[in-house]
Swiss-Prot record:
Domain of life: Bacteria
Native species: Actinobacillus pleuropneumoniae serotype 5b (strain L20)
One Gene Ontology term from the biological process aspect of the record: queuosine biosynthetic process
Name used for this protein in its record: 7-cyano-7-deazaguanine synthase
GO MF entries: ATP binding; ligase activity, forming carbon-nitrogen bonds; zinc ion binding
Keywords: ATP-binding, Ligase, Metal-binding, Nucleotide-binding, Queuosine biosynthesis, Zinc
Length: 222
C-alpha cells in the first residue's frame, strides 16, 4: 500500500468543508486528498451539486455515500418541509446522529484506502447549538473509532474554535477567499447565492461583513 500520507475531507460543498478542503490540499497536496459527500435525504439537491462541482473543479476524488436511511428514523427541518425554528437549546435543523454517522462511514472508507487523517468542518464557536459539533464529541468519536477498528485515525477540526469571521480570514490566508465566497453553498433553504434570512446565511454573511470591515480598516491603517 502507498505510504504517502493522505487525507479525506467530509465534504458538503459549504463554506466550512471547502475551507477544510483547501487546508488539506495545502498540507497534503491535491493528489493526496479525497472527499466524501453524504446523501442523507437533505431537502435540496443544490448541496450535492455544489459538492460535486467543486470536487471536479479542484481535481479531487469524490466518493458519494448514501445514508438516506436516517430519514426513516428521524425528522427535522433539514430533510423535510418544516419551518426552521429553535426547539429548546437545539434548532430543528439538527439531524440526530448525523456527524457520528458521517465520521463512522468516513472512517470505514478511510481505513480501506489506507488513510488516517480525516478533516471535518465542525465548529463550536459560532455553532448553531448542534451537540455533535462540539470538540468533546469529536475527541470521543476519535477514540471510539480507533478502538472499534484497531486503527489510529487523526480527526482534524481546523475550524473548531474559529468564529465565522476567522474562518473567512483562514480562507483568505489559504488563497481561497474569492473561490469560497463565489462557489460554496450554505443556505438551509437551498437558495442559490443564499436567502439572506435563514440562520446559516445570517451567520455566514455576518462573519463575512465583519472580516471585510476589519480587512478594509487594516488596509487604511497601513
Amino acid at each position: 500500500m502507498n505510504s504517502t500520507p493522505k487525507a479525506v475531507v467530509i465534504f458538503s460543498g459549504g463554506q466550512d468543508s471547502t475551507t477544510c478542503l483547501f487546508q488539506a490540499i495545502q498540507e497534503f497536496g491535491v493528489e493526496n486528498v479525497e472527499v466524501v459527500t453524504f446523501q442523507y435525504g437533505q431537502r435540496h439537491a443544490i448541496e450535492l451539486e455544489k459538492a460535486a462541482w467543486i470536487a471536479k473543479d479542484l481535481g479531487v476524488k469524490q466518493t458519494l455515500i448514501d445514508t438516506s436511511v436516517i430519514k426513516a428514523i428521524t425528522s427535522n427541518a433539514m430533510m423535510e418541509e418544516h419551518e426552521i425554528k429553535q426547539e429548546g437549546n437545539t434548532p430543528n435543523t439538527f439531524v440526530d446522529g448525523r456527524n457520528a454517522l458521517f465520521l463512522l462511514y468516513t472512517a470505514i472508507y478511510a481505513k480501506g484506502q489506507g488513510i488516517r487523517t480525516i478533516f471535518t468542518g465542525v465548529c463550536e464557536t459560532d455553532f448553531s447549538g448542534y451537540p455533535d459539533c462540539r470538540d468533546v464529541f469529536v475527541k470521543s468519536m476519535n477514540v471510539t473509532l480507533n478502538l472499534a477498528m484497531d486503527y489510529n485515525f487523526n480527526i482534524r477540526t481546523p475550524l473548531m474554535y474559529l468564529t465565522k469571521k476567522q474562518t473567512w480570514a483562514l480562507a483568505d490566508k489559504l488563497g481561497a477567499f474569492d473561490y469560497i465566497r463565489q462557489h460554496t453553498h450554505t443556505c438551509y433553504l437551498g437558495v442559490e447565492g443564499g436567502c439572506h434570512t435563514c440562520p446559516s446565511c445570517v451567520l455566514r454573511e455576518k462573519g463575512l461583513n465583519e472580516y471585510l470591515s476589519e480587512k478594509t480598516s487594516g488596509q487604511k491603517n497601513v
